Amino acid sequence: MLKFTKITLSALALITASLGAANAAVTVLGWPGGSEETALRAVAEAYNAQSGVADADKVELLFYSRDGFYDKLQADMAAGSSAFDINLLATYSIGRYASYMEPVDLGPDAAKVFGESVLKTMQFDGKQYGVPTDLSLHFMYYRKDLIDALLADPAAKTKYAEISEKYFGKPLEPKAPDSWTWDDWAATALYFAKSVNPESPVRYGTVLQMKNLLFNIMVWQSVARANGGDWMDASGNITIDSPAYRTALELYKKLYDAGASPKDSLSYEYAETNAAFGSGQVATALQWNAAAGELTDPAKSPAVAENVGIVAPPAGSAGRADHIHGLGLGINKNAKNKPGAAKFLQWLATEDAALLYARSGGSPALLPDVAAKIAKERPDLVTLGQYAGAYGYVMTGATSANAFPVYELQAKEFTGYWSGQETLDEALANTKAGMEKLLKP
């Protein structure tokens, strides 16, 4: 049976001893929680069950908290830890960890499964450092039944116009979600908030991920990007204090202060967002694509699954934008079982393994002919490829060695603004000053 453990940084030093006789096994430090963990468990179980896998090469999984994950990982790898053979890596952090990792040959079939462009998300300086397991971007999830009822009700449209005029200074008409601007989405969220509209059939219009966590900034920042926002200009000047960023930050605060999102949203991230939307009391949610499998599964989200609609994030003055990055698994340079680790990653890059990973809730970016084999079960993976190609972006400077500290800085300052601990001017000034230090040439 597959073993897995949740660990903290202090516990990593004890892993070698705690594994005992299993020291020869392939230990995998994965991404904790969510569909990525679920899918990794499934493929590891399947791999271990194969008759051709020696006991010394069977996989064991390790997990620790998302908070500070990459800093902990870097500290471990820089210290020469051999507590894990395989570790998580991401497009935006490969350069940070490449010197601590071993390039891997995934075999000739990997390109037939993922395609060269996806394989490149796990490459650095022309070398392959991992197998791409998940492509991450964001979907706008919404309740089809609620939106359909709004669009069909003249009285509801009148109420919607009144609410939008109060909050945006202009009356807006309800639209189909695929035609939403960010103002349209916000007006819809306000309409479905009982604090704003006591006649709303649900309690909240949306659920915002506002915890002081860098990944929440990745979700939010598409509002700024859609309005032309970026971290830096072509000359390397920090451009964070811009109308695009101000508009995006103010929009979230407006919704939060109005009660369109739960008051404890300041502690929300991925799991809390899924739970809130899945409860049936939320009309919309900007959430990672990985949530699609759970939110559209009647067994996991019975209150909403049959009525979940999915579109790309709304448009701003510069069009639509969707943050994108890849997650994968690579080999620790100090791994105790490099041959066993390479075998597991090579297997993970096969079509059968990729399809199992997808069926188990993961979100691999697959070539069309491979994705077609799972389109009925996972239509979101087809959508994933479409949105990535049309709206995907990476902020200028967001693949640098200090990308994570920048995201952490933004999370701290922007959450401070949303929670009322500092003004918008203070938050942007502090962020700009910090980014100028972190991203200086």
Where are the regions that the model predicts?
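Short, polar/charged alpha-helical segment
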Residues: 34-58, 141, 410, 428
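Extracytoplasmic "Venus flytrap"
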Residues: 26-43, 64-67, 136, 211-214, ...
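Hinge/lid segment of periplasmic solute-binding proteins
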Residues: 89-141, 145-154, 183, 216, ...
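Long, aromatic- and glycine/proline-rich binding clefts that accommodate carbohydrate-like moieties
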Residues: 122, 306-312, 358-416, 441
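Extracytoplasmic/periplasmic substrate-binding proteins
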Residues: 30-31, 48, 94, 217-227, ...
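Extracytoplasmic/periplasmic substrate-recognition and gating elements
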Residues: 55, 126-128, 146, 257-260, ...
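Helix-loop-helix "hinge/cap" segment bordering the ligand-binding cleft or interdomain interface
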Residues: 49, 55, 124-215, 229-265, ...
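Extracytoplasmic "Venus flytrap"/periplasmic binding protein-like
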Residues: 26-27, 46, 51-117, 121-123, ...
